[in-house]
Amino acid sequence: MEKSNMIWSILLHLGSNMWAKKERELCSPVYKDYDDDFVYRDHMHCDREVWRKVTEFLPECGINTVIVDIGDGVVLDSHPEIAIDGAWTKDELRADIKRMRNLGLEVIPKCNFSCGHSAWMKEYAYMVGTETYYKFCDDVVSEIIELFDTPRFFHLGLEEEDADAQKNQPIAIVRAPAIKMRDALRLFNVCISRGTRPWIWTDQRTIDAFGGDEAFRSQMPREVLHSVWYYGIIRDTEGVLETNSAAKAFKKLADWGMQQVPTCSTWSWHLNAKDVVRICSKYIDENSIKGYMMAPWQLTHKNKYYSLLNAAYTLGVAREMYYGKD
């Protein structure tokens, strides 16, 4: 991958209901009335001014791509019933996409279709496996692709769909591997048929949820873009590709001929971006590395403003250290 064509991206949240379903506080009292990013909200939490200021800062850091986590944060024509109070209209989002593109940013949509991150779907989250559910998914993906003027990619999530990841939810839904693969292939086909490449989270846990290494390697379309996410320390020591779970996953995807955008964060280790970019630039086949993503996991709110700026800046620093400034 030529340096000039690489993706240097950040995940920003428009909607916020990708984690806690309604009544989660009945299972985990800590979430009740708790000022946390991962509670269910029936109103918009995204601060428009913070959104604008953060996105305007990105080019200064060398960030060239924004992944917009939409969820229930926009009023869709096909399913206005899922939108929360204060959700952006399509015209508002369309105008903001134009503004960001004028800044030189590529704008990529994201909606998470994992059963473990489906609070934004409202009642459709509990209809998995039905024709109503499949029509809902098709409608949402198709309308968003049109809204974003056929983007290069559509991030579909699809991670953390197991019982342990949903242990604090009021209702946990886990698809059998064959069903999860079938449903994912359906989503992929909706994207590909409309000229957009699918993009998913791909750690070993997700690979196992799809049926394990062989099923994933043999059935996963090569059009799909992958993001292994790892937020801890990666020591550049002898044998790191065998001892560190993320490094192993980066190499595994490369060996399988899959393109990837390794994902870092300031969530738990402030130098994680440097670690991830160093390991991948040094050890992983450059033809597999499409770019990198910063996922701060901080909502777009005034209380998180400086955290978001710092996250973007740290990825920019890592980019300059290992790929140069230009």
Language model regions located:
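Substrate-binding cleft of secreted/luminal carbohydrate-active enzymes
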Residues: W256-D326
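Glycine-enriched alpha-helix->loop->beta-strand junction motifs that scaffold or abut catalytic
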Residues: G195-R197, Q219-L225, A254-Q260, E286-I289
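Structural motif
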Residues: L12-G15, T202-Q204, W229-Y231, C264-W267, ...
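Active-site-adjacent beta->alpha loops and helix N-cap segments on the catalytic face
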Residues: K90, T243-N244
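Substrate-binding cleft/loops of secretory-pathway carbohydrate-active enzymes
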Residues: A125, W199-E242, A249, W269-I284
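N-terminal amphipathic alpha-helix/helix-capping segment at the start of soluble metabolic enzymes
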Residues: M1-S9
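Aromatic-lined carbohydrate-binding surfaces of glycoside hydrolases
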Residues: L11-L225
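Charged, low-complexity C-terminal accessory regions
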Residues: H117, P151, H155, D164-N168, ...
